[in-house]
């Protein structure tokens, strides 16, 4: 990539920093997660949570959601201008679970947003620490990616539900900045653009006037983000066409869907970061660990290390399998929802099962669920090896893949063949090949057809022992390629509902 020199690393995006060297990046990322940890400890004190209750992932999620809601300016403003019955725009809260007489009970708490903002700033040296907020958003997004399927959303925008491997970050709020944009999959960006174009088709004033100019800027910015994810000239050239269109309409939607499909073989670069629940950072800070001094990275050994010695609990519903709940959270912690299960299993050291076979629902408990029979268990979040997270899609080649998911988006930089089912994917490319983008389409299809199965991605990259923090001895695993590797295969998971 010619533009590599102008790119900021994702730690820089994450911490909003300008160009920094590796040590400065490690320090500023450390400062960010340390701030999250300090905030969490303070909140546990405010809410009077016991040590055990503070390690409950459901409590962590409630506290994270409270601070995100406290800083959601546009929604806060909207709530103040459009008061709705029974909703205090100045307050935020959620369910907190406490242990009483050997049982778990749910208690709804309510706090002033102002108070939450004060505690957050105090934990972050008086700053707004937007990077920390984005970090929490990405953790929630990774958890959603591992938990829910987006079939409905894909179908609504005219995309194929089997393209789910392109949907990383599809539930991230718009305000998640550069760090958020970096982790969004190609399908997510395409979906956002299609929604925008559809509004323009239905609403004549969408692109007009003062607001329309702002809309247009946003549209072009999103096109550029998506263009930057593609690794071939033809895909990028097509994105230029989409961006420069005078009046975006159905032709652009067609082009975008074509590009999304092409990304199943000619993969985009999508960043992956291990973002952990706030309680994990809280535990480390409470035990005296100084993140800023020690430095921290979201893409190296650090998150694996942290999970190796953190004990986090989760509420378990009566018929759920605690091991499966652990797998779900482990995948979320390492943003591995779209990774090949064989690679993840090797790193974790235990076999991961496809989502359709998981006996567990989401981590969060709905307000109408009965707490009587709820139990809690330790989440097993440790791993056997660690591996570097990738921001590239890997080079592209072919291998037998499943009916439920026809490609993967690699998370770990580990040598392997990347599976995709060529017949299924190529079948989608018959038909419409005229119009302005025909030569680019032809070129893209040619590249896809010539993608070779024997090509190995991430050549020579391997996993590392947890004692090998400098990544000196890569272990290149060999995978049983006859096996099924996709997580969303034969799926029956719940849909994501806002």
Curated annotation (Swiss-Prot):
Family annotation (InterPro entries): Flu_NP
Keyword Repressor among record annotations: no
Which GO cellular component term is one of those annotated?
Answer: viral nucleocapsid
Q: Which UniProt keywords are present, listed alphabetically?
A: Capsid protein, Helical capsid protein, Host nucleus, Host-virus interaction, Ribonucleoprotein, RNA-binding, Viral nucleoprotein, Viral penetration into host nucleus, Virion, Virus entry into host cell
Q: Which residue ranges are recorded for the region named Disordered?
A: 1-21
Entry annotated with the keyword Cytoplasm: no
* Gene Ontology terms, MF aspect: RNA binding; structural molecule activity
Q: Where is this motif: Unconventional nuclear localization signal?
A: 1-18
- Where do we find the motif Bipartite nuclear localization signal here? 198-216
Cite the post-translational modification comment: Late in virus-infected cells, may be cleaved from a 56-kDa protein to a 53-kDa protein by a cellular caspase. This cleavage might be a marker for the onset of apoptosis in infected cells or have a specific function in virus host interaction.
Q: Which GO terms describe its biological process?
A: symbiont entry into host cell; viral penetration into host nucleus
The subcellular location is: Virion; Host nucleus
Query: Which domain of life does the UniProt lineage start with?
Result: Viruses
Quaternary structure, per UniProt, is: Homomultimerizes to form the nucleocapsid. May bind host exportin-1/XPO1. Binds to viral genomic RNA. Protein-RNA contacts are mediated by a combination of electrostatic interactions between positively charged residues and the phosphate backbone and planar interactions between aromatic side chains and bases.
Q: Which family does it belong to?
A: Belongs to the influenza viruses nucleoprotein family.
Q: What does this protein do?
A: Encapsidates the negative strand viral RNA, protecting it from nucleases. The encapsidated genomic RNA is termed the ribonucleoprotein (RNP) and serves as template for transcription and replication. The RNP needs to be localized in the host nucleus to start an infectious cycle, but is too large to diffuse through the nuclear pore complex. NP comprises at least 2 nuclear localization signals that are responsible for the active RNP import into the nucleus through cellular importin alpha/beta pathway.
| Record-linked HAMAP family | INFV_NCAP
- Name the record gives this protein: Nucleoprotein
